[in-house]
């Protein structure tokens, strides 16, 4: 199984929608079902890399994305997910998620707030102990931030649905 063969077999395997194992040069036909251990990996297009953070359906608490979040991530991908939760749960069926590794983006600031404001269910927003550069946000600011975020999400949803 040399590199040339790997490439050929891998391409063939991709065409039939299988999963290629480079160590054995074998192709396993893969049926993608929305089962309890389905994981979505990052997809790349020419224009934009869309990172799908920790979207293992076997770890529902970590699911912090729906279509609208995808749109935001396309343009502003940073740590918009719970990294610890991600590390613990992003190994469904051995799938590896590069997004779950430590990233080199700043640990605080806008995306830190986003990560803490997004709740997995229902598009509600919750700001617990949100800190920006070591300073806690006042409840008034949290409320304003949540409102601005909801308006933005609503606006984006309207565009997507139009």
Curated annotation (Swiss-Prot):
Salivary gland. Residues 52-162 are annotated as: Unique region. GO terms for cellular component: extracellular region. The keyword Secreted applies. The keyword Metal-binding does not apply. It is found in: Secreted. Its main location: secreted. Residues 1-31 are annotated as: Last constant region. Residues 32-51 are annotated as: Last Cys-1 repeat. Keywords: Repeat, Secreted. It comes from the Eukaryota. Used by the larvae to construct a supramolecular structure, the larval tube. This is Balbiani ring protein 2. It comes from Chironomus pallidivittatus. The lineage of its organism: Eukaryota, Metazoa, Ecdysozoa, Arthropoda, Hexapoda.
């Amino acid at each position: 199984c040399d590199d040339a063969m790997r490439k050929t077999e891998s391409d063939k395997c991709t065409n039939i929608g299988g999963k290629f194992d480079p160590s054995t040069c074998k192709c396993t036909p893969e049926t993608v079902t929305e089962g309890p251990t389905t994981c979505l990996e990052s997809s790349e297009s020419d224009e934009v890399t869309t990172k799908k953070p920790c979207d293992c359906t076997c770890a529902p608490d970590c699911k912090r994305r729906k279509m609208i979040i995808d749109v935001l991530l396309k343009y502003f991908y940073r740590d918009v997910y719970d990294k610890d939760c991600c590390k613990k749960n992003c190994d469904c069926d051995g799938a590896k998620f590069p997004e779950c590794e430590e990233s080199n983006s700043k640990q605080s600031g806008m995306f830190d707030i986003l990560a803490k404001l997004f709740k997995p269910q229902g598009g509600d927003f919750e700001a617990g102990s949100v800190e920006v550069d070591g300073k806690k946000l006042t409840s008034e600011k949290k409320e304003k931030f949540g409102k601005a975020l909801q308006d933005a999400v609503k606006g984006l949803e309207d565009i997507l649905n139009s």
